[in-house]
Amino acid sequence: MVFKAKSPKINIEEVRALSKLEGAALARKNQRDQELEAIIRGEDQRILLVIGPCSSDNEEAVLEYAKRLSALQEEIKDRIFMVMRVYTAKPRTNGDGYKGLIHQPNATEAPSLINGIKAVRQLHYRVITETGMTTADEMLYPENLPLVDDLISYMAVGARSVEDQQHRFVASGADFSTGFKNPTSGNLNVMFNGIYAAQNKQSFLFLGKEVETTGNPLSHAILRGALNEYGKNIPNYYYDNLMDTIDQYEKMGLENPFIIIDTNHDNSGKQYMDQIRIVRQTLINRDWNEKIKKYVRGFMIESYLEDGRQNEPEVFGKSITDPCLGWDNTEALVREIYQTLGE
């Protein structure tokens, strides 16, 4: 094998000790984690929003967003529960492009994974301790989960990872809510098999040890649209798509059935303003059908301080990966959801 070591072996406990939750911050996180679990289990009927930037490319911009989101959360907490996207590792279709904070703690400088790992923990820690929001991240690298598992409240297994056995098995050992996206092909069997594997006990090798998990009953579905062989996006948030997904959920008899609609990616064709329309249409479908209302109880929304995207990090709070809703549009959408739920 041709692997050249660029650093000494990372001591996970030393890294975790640099930003460890204690006192009021730890109590706040535990309380919010319990509320989130109750939502996934169907004991709390609030709508879940996993919301925030496509990628957390700038610590101060992310914190400014988190402060605004925290203030908004207080106003709508009786109908909506929000977990903030703090996505620090980004899958790339061909391996090129910005790969996230863990690779590049400064988006304008050379990659540094050692500094990136510290930056990832620091950012999750600061969002929780300075704003009271709890966070979501994507499990792109399963072996890195011990670096953040004490800080995050929600984990997503992405469209390119959902069929991977290691991702599924590691998710089975997570003690927090974990969403599985449908693959880019749109094959729901792949997603549901991932959820099934994660909800059950597994034995496997992890970090050089043989481990056994108890299963993660909080694993659930995220519909993110698909791409056909010609590169055309195929949304799967429509009424018939939802009924098909619910039917498959019921046939498999999985625990805690819960569906999140990812409003961007191949549902919107990355036309970020379409996220608003997709939310509206889904809320209408919930009103039309009690089964949809029972199962579809969350949205994943990509939003940041400024609308759209940019190639280089020039505008503060504007995405350098997928285009996002800006803050004004985000706040208006969240308030609209709140009002609709009260009607």
Question: Where do the protein language model's features map onto the residues?
Answer:
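Conserved, mostly hydrophobic/aromatic
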Residues: 52, 261, 326
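Active-site-facing alpha/beta catalytic cores
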Residues: 66, 79-244, 248, 265-270, ...
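N- or domain-start disorder-to-order transition segments that initiate the globular core
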Residues: 1-41
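Glycine-rich phosphate/diphosphate-binding loops that line cofactor/substrate pockets in enzymes
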Residues: 37-45, 251-256
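Internal helix-turn-beta structural module
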Residues: 303-341
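Conserved phosphate/anionic-ligand binding catalytic regions in large, soluble enzymes, centered on
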Residues: 48-61, 322
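Short acidic, Gly/Ser-rich segments with clustered Asp/Glu that frequently serve as metal-coordination loops
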Residues: 54-57, 256, 264-270
